[in-house]
From Swiss-Prot:
Taxonomic path: Bacteria, Pseudomonadati, Pseudomonadota, Gammaproteobacteria, Enterobacterales
GO MF annotation, one: zinc ion binding
Cofactor: how bound: Binds 1 zinc ion per subunit. The zinc ion is important for the structural integrity of the protein.
Catalytic activity: L-methionyl-[protein] + [thioredoxin]-disulfide + H2O = L-methionyl-(R)-S-oxide-[protein] + [thioredoxin]-dithiol
An annotated GO BP: protein repair
E.C. numbers: 1.8.4.12
Biological source species: Salmonella arizonae (strain ATCC BAA-731 / CDC346-86 / RSK2980)
Name by which UniProt lists this protein: Peptide methionine sulfoxide reductase MsrB
Gene behind the chain: msrB
Similarity field: Belongs to the MsrB Met sulfoxide reductase family.
GO cellular component, one term: cytoplasm
InterPro entries: Met_Sox_Rdtase_MsrB, Met_Sox_Rdtase_MsrB_dom, Mss4-like_sf
Length: 137
């Protein structure tokens, strides 16, 4: 795993919500994330290590309150972990590069994959394809 910043360094770099989500497996409140309604063309990166995670053309409105994607940029971009917390059986997704918590993946997405990668905005940064502007969740 590439991210080896200390907890103190990450606390200085990230907002309280970003730290909570990425380092403590937290979840931001639904419909509050800065990147939920972003419709620009570009790439969504890990907020912690900047590794590319999702292309904008795989993003869709699932109605769940968090940015949703049907496919990551590569198999290596995401790490999958069985999650049995909160009395549920889910699959947690983490950054394949730095192990930051991103959200969960569910088998109820659209074709071509049938998967819904439900991702906290607070774990993402977005790079605009046209002008290079960056937005952080």
């Amino acid at each position: 795993m590439a991210n080896q910043l200390s907890a103190e360094e990450l606390k200085k770099k990230l907002s309280e919500m970003q730290f909570y989500v990425t380092q403590n497996r937290g979840t931001e409140p639904p419909f509050t994330g800065r990147l939920l309604h972003n419709k620009r063309d570009g790439v969504y990166h890990c907020l912690v290590c900047e590794a590319p995670l999702f292309h904008s053309h795989t993003k869709y409105d699932s109605g769940c309150g968090w940015p949703s994607f049907y496919q990551p940029v590569s198999k290596e971009a995401i790490r999958y972990i069985d999650d049995f917390s909160h009395g549920m059986q889910r699959v947690e997704i983490r950054c394949g590069n730095c192990d930051a918590h991103l959200g969960h993946v569910f088998p109820d997405g659209p074709q071509p994959t049938g998967e819904r990668y439900c991702v906290n905005s607070a774990s993402l940064a977005f790079s605009d394809e046209k002008n290079g502007d960056q937005l952080k969740g």
